[in-house]
Amino acid sequence: MSSSQNNNSSWIDWFLGIKGNQFLCRVPTDYVQDTFNQMGLEYFSEILDVILKPVIDSSSGLLYGDEKKWYGMIHARYIRSERGLIAMHRKYMRGDFGSCPNISCDRQNTLPVGLSAVWGKSTVKIHCPRCKSNFHPKSDTQLDGAMFGPSFPDIFFSLLPNLTSPLDDPRT
């Protein structure tokens, strides 16, 4: 932890503040603490204590290890909930995830996508809803793609279909 780190910060505050983690949204404490949302995640009681502490304790031995994966998997679940979709919608509308590099997409906003739901398989990509292509993000991020999963853009746009228009068909 840097000496400039606020002593009242939680692990979540610290983690979300790391350069490259701007694609992530804050998962509310009540969502994190709900045991239903923790099902299937290992070491949840120990990690929960670390990520929810008001002060980061670097002597815990867990710092930035299993917490990153655990928070990432909770995040993947959260962004599929109503509150999570609202948070990601806000980020999408602000253009936080970047825009499509395809010139015919006219700087269409993109969404983060994972090529796999399995941790450690690939880093996050950005998905353009107009051309349906995935690209490497311009931002300096090494987030695991499982933090979003391969179905997130489909879920997002099936619930919010008016956010994009398809590419013009040159045959019409």
From Swiss-Prot:
Induction: In wild-type flies, it is strongly down-regulated by double-stranded RNA (dsRNA) interference mediated by Su(Ste) transcripts. In males lacking the Y chromosome, the absence of Su(Ste) locus, relieves such down-regulation, explaining why it is strongly expressed. GO terms for cellular component: cytoplasm; nucleus; protein kinase CK2 complex. Probably not expressed in wild-type flies. In males lacking the Y chromosome, it is testis-specific and constitutes the main component of star-shaped crystals. GO terms for molecular function: protein kinase regulator activity. It comes from the Eukaryota. InterPro entries: Casein_kin_II_reg-sub_N, Casein_kinase_II_beta-like, Casein_kinase_II_reg-sub. There are multiple copies of the stellate gene in fruit fly, encoding proteins that are extremely similar, which makes their individual characterization difficult. Thus, most experiments probably do not discriminate between the different members. Belongs to the casein kinase 2 subunit beta family. Unknown. In males lacking the Y chromosome, its strong overexpression leads to the appearance of proteinaceous star-shaped crystals in the primary spermatocytes causing meiotic drive, possibly by interfering with normal casein kinase 2 activity. Interacts in vitro with the casein kinase 2 alpha subunit (CkII-alpha). The relevance of such interaction is however unclear in vivo. This is Stellate protein CG33237. It comes from Drosophila melanogaster. The lineage of its organism: Eukaryota, Metazoa, Ecdysozoa, Arthropoda, Hexapoda. The gene is Ste:CG33237.
